[in-house]
Amino acid sequence: MLRWLTAGESHGPALVAILEGLPAGVSVTSDDIAAALLRRRAGYGRGARMKFEKDEVSIIGGIRHGRTLGGPVAIQVGNTEWPKWQKVMSPDPVPAEELEGVARNAPLTRPRPGHADLVGMQKYGYDEARPILERASARETAARVALGEVARQFLRQALGVEIVSHVVAMGSVSVPDDAPIPAPEDLARVDADPVRCFDPETSARMVAEVDDTRKTGDTLGGVVEVIAYGLPPGLGSHVHWDRRLDARLAGALMGIQAIKGVEFGDGFRTAARRGSAAHDEIDVGPDGIRRRSNRAGGVEGGMSTGDPLRVRAAMKPIATVPRALDTIDVSTGQPAQAHHQRSDVTAVPAAGVVAEAMVALVLADAALEKFGGDSVAETVRNLRGYLDSLIVR
């Protein structure tokens, strides 16, 4: 079983991430993790913060000479902007005179609609939003992307699983229903696209949508799809709600900031169909039993089917709107304009990379639940034994 935790604030010295339960022998380096973090920063519509804040990766435990040791993996993602925030975000007390007149230390008393600001202040007893927004920020996803890269390498090396994502909708622009989906070898092409869309014509329309939205001082949401190739049948279980693979994946994806909906395969479209047109019929092909389609998205009864896993996540428009939404100044009780931090027009392309990481972590957990192993070699052996012993093929 895998367990993972992250710690740190948006403008703190670093984010720290710990992954426990990974077998020994997974090949992974700082460069692998740095490359994953660079993918998270890309995408048309990102804000100025992506240009000057850098992710400094340090592996501080669990890996030696490029291979996991079997103990907890600890990764630090440093914040190059920390010197500017050192006094404001200091863990230790700072004399009041040193903070006097520091603009960054001004109380944030105008909570932003759509953020954790207001309810977080109420829940934790703060009279300003800084202590809430620092942890609620999507900056925290950098730590999850770092851990997700380690999980991705395990899945690739132990199971032969490959994960790819792409943007399928941005604002009012969507890829056609019959558009091809990217294969693992297409990931570089997807990443090279400004909005990480696999369809060039749709990509151009998405870029125009971002430009129009920027001109009006607004923000844009969208939908990303994650596809996992090479999964064996039987990850997850039907026996309890919390062991169902789709439930675990949905929870992980809903835990990403600004994600408001998740669907598998044809998802909500199946609700409008008759049952005879909603399911995947079964027959026998040259390689054994197979499904004629993949409307279920690679999951049936809470278990992977062996077909490609297809899951989509809907991201709401970023809540920090440049033209500022109406709110209340909690220090005066009077109407006010919401505090505006630097923000993106859209972060949908980056959301796909974060979604990949969460899918990788859940799938790695499910794989270890099924096959176990204190080393990658042991996991591979157990997987082969399982596949060789399948009664129904």
Swiss-Prot record:
InterPro entries per record: Chorismate_synth, Chorismate_synth_AroC_sf, Chorismate_synthase_CS
Protein residues bound to FMN: 135-137, 257-258, 301, 316-320, 342
Cofactor(s) the record lists: FMNH2
Biological process per Gene Ontology, one example term: chorismate biosynthetic process
Pfam family, one: Chorismate_synt
Entry annotated with the keyword Flavoprotein: yes
Keyword set, alphabetical order: Amino-acid biosynthesis, Aromatic amino acid biosynthesis, FAD, Flavoprotein, FMN, Lyase, NADP
Catalyzed reactions: 5-O-(1-carboxyvinyl)-3-phosphoshikimate = chorismate + phosphate
Family membership noted in the UniProt record: Belongs to the chorismate synthase family.
Function, as annotated: This reaction introduces a second double bond into the aromatic ring system.
NCBIfam families cross-referenced by the UniProt entry: aroC (TIGR00033), PRK05382.1 (NF003793)
Descriptive protein name: Chorismate synthase
The organism of origin for this protein: Thermobifida fusca (strain YX)
Gene name of the record: aroC
